[in-house]
């Protein structure tokens, strides 16, 4: 169902652009200059909020520095709101940047999930449970870091 909704809106612009225009209802949590936050309609837990830029772009790199800064200000404000309501200072914050990363709606969005004791949420490792963890290969990590430092 969720993927079907996202695909339906791709031909008309993104689902989130339609939300921003008021064409699709949302459950607003907060908004500010350059960002809008609303409850995810398929929450992973109570309070699961999406923070989006008001300009429709698919990838973080397409936002200007000011837009990225504004988006993170929105994330921080949402954390404050959710933290007060759920009595927590702990959050899972996640961005799926592109379809291979799991992005279902082609509009940048930041997931903000309040975390509380016993919520059964997992760590990053729980996202790839079949991937074995091994001892760090510092030689390979060092080589990759050197390559990445020279990347454009």
Walk through the language-model features, giving the residues of each:
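HIT superfamily nucleotide-processing domains
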Residues: 2-152
């Amino acid at each position: 169902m969720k993927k079907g909704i996202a695909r339906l809106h791709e031909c008309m612009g993104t689902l989130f652009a339609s939300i921003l225009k008021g064409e699709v209802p949302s459950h607003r949590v907060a908004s500010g200059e350059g960002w809008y936050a609303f409850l995810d309609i398929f929450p992973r837990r109570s309070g699961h909020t999406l923070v989006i830029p008001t300009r429709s772009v698919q990838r973080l790199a397409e936002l200007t520095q000011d837009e990225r800064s504004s988006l993170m200000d929105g994330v921080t404000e949402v954390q404050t709101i959710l933290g007060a309501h759920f009595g927590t200072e702990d959050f899972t914050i996640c961005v799926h940047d592109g379809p291979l990363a799991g992005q279902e709606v082609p509009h940048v969005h930041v997931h903000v999930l309040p975390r509380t004791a016993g919520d059964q949420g997992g760590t990053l490792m729980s996202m790839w449970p079949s991937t074995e963890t091994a001892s760090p290969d510092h030689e390979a990590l060092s080589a990759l870091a050197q390559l990445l430092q020279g990347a454009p």
